[in-house]
From Swiss-Prot:
It catalyses: (S)-malate + NAD(+) = oxaloacetate + NADH + H(+). The gene is mdh. InterPro entries: L-lactate/malate_DH, Lactate/malate_DH_C, Lactate/malate_DH_N, Lactate_DH/Glyco_Ohase_4_C, Malate_DH_AS, Malate_DH_type2, NAD(P)-bd_dom_sf. It comes from Psychrobacter cryohalolentis (strain ATCC BAA-1226 / DSM 17306 / VKM B-2378 / K5). The active site is at H189. NAD(+) binds at G13, A14, A15, G16, N17, I18, S19, N107, Q114, V131, G132, N133. It comes from the Bacteria. It is an enzyme of class 1 (oxidoreductase). It holds the Pfam family Ldh_1_N. This is Malate dehydrogenase. GO terms for biological process: malate metabolic process; tricarboxylic acid cycle.
Length: 329
């Protein structure tokens, strides 16, 4: 197999748990293909650089044929130099006694700086995935600070919610995730997200014909919305491996394309589709081809139930954006 030229992949929060579950898989070719060498450009805060050094030692010790180089730094302009992909995983976690507004502001500072650095030094075609929470709003902040880059290059991860929703539906219908098609997560990566089965099928049959409405509204939706909290309760730590898996899948789909007759959920820049306010980064059903995404047209969102759920998560995203509006250019 002839090798391509290496591409540069930046990962922030590179010594953290999600990155630890992700970097080895990127270096093995799982994200961009087995014929695509990568240079990893890893960003951490200064106090974590020693821990990062240990991760890099382990990466070296794997002797990955596709790993063409590693950069370790606490300087965003070094980490983002000429990058083709940027996975923004690092964010400020919510500490004791911290209000949501404080969390938004702390992250606004981080993602403003990263957006500016991407604007200054990244490839003009850089594909950005924000994983660090609140992911949708952090993506808006980075995007607004990168006026020279196409807003379509900035995405937020709702693939984890999408995968959770598929797994729960497969379990309920005694099928496998391979049988589930056309899942949708609308809105924010938060407990207001709307896992919508209106268009979904299981083995070609409409999902809503296979499950009862009371289960769908009363059990399924809240379970998908609150799955992250359930994992923290059970594991004593937040989901890391499943988040890393979803991040890899998000980028791989964006680059390699969606399967025929199926789609995925991605937090992407709204241009007013489905009546959602322009400029929000909102999760829509999308198809991907030739390294680009497009929002699926014509999904039926006419029911009062759908309208209400989509508006509630949009309102939360608008409120988050408004809370940091004074920090946006």
């Amino acid at each position: 197999m002839s090798m391509k030229q290496p591409v540069r992949v930046a990962v922030t929060g590179a010594a953290g748990n999600i990155s630890y579950a992700m970097l080895f898989r990127i270096a093995s070719g799982e994200m961009l293909g087995k014929d695509q060498p990568v240079i990893l450009q890893l960003l951490e805060i200064a106090p974590a650089l020693d821990a990062l050094k240990g991760v890099v030692m382990e990466l070296e010790d794997c002797a990955f044929p596709l790993l063409a180089g590693v950069v370790q730094t606490d300087d965003a302009t070094v980490a983002f130099k000429d990058v083709d992909y940027a996975l923004l995983v690092g964010s400020r976690p919510r500490g004791p006694g911290m209000e949501r507004k404080d969390l938004l502001e702390a992250n606004a500072a981080i993602f403003s700086a990263q957006g500016k650095a991407l604007n200054d030094v990244a490839s003009r075609d850089v594909k950005v995935l924000v994983v660090g929470n609140p992911a949708n709003t952090n993506a808006v902040i980075a995007q607004r600070n990168a006026p020279d880059l196409d807003p379509r290059n900035f995405t937020a991860m709702t693939r984890l919610d999408h995968n959770r929703a598929m797994a729960q539906l497969a379990g309920k219908t005694d099928s496998t995730v391979n049988d589930v098609k056309k899942m949708i997560i609308w809105g924010n990566h938060s407990s207001t997200q709307y896992p919508d089965l209106t268009a979904s099928t299981v083995n070609g049959k409409p999902a809503l014909d296979l499950v009862d409405r009371a289960w769908y509204e009363g059990t399924y939706i809240p379970e998908v919305q609150q799955r992250g909290a359930a994992i923290i309760k059970a594991r004593g730590a937040s989901s890391a491996a499943s988040a890393a898996n979803a991040a890899i899948a998000h980028v791989r789909t964006w680059v390699m394309g969606t399967d025929e007759n199926d789609w995925v959920s991605m937090g992407v820049y709204s241009n007013g589709e489905y009546g959602i306010a322009k400029g929000l980064i909102y999760s829509f059903p999308v198809t991907c081809a030739n390294g680009d995404w497009s929002i699926v047209d014509g999904v039926d969102v006419s029911s009062d139930f759908s309208k209400e759920k989509m508006a509630a998560t949009e309102q939360e995203l608008s409120e988050e954006r408004d809370a940091v509006a004074h920090l946006l250019p």
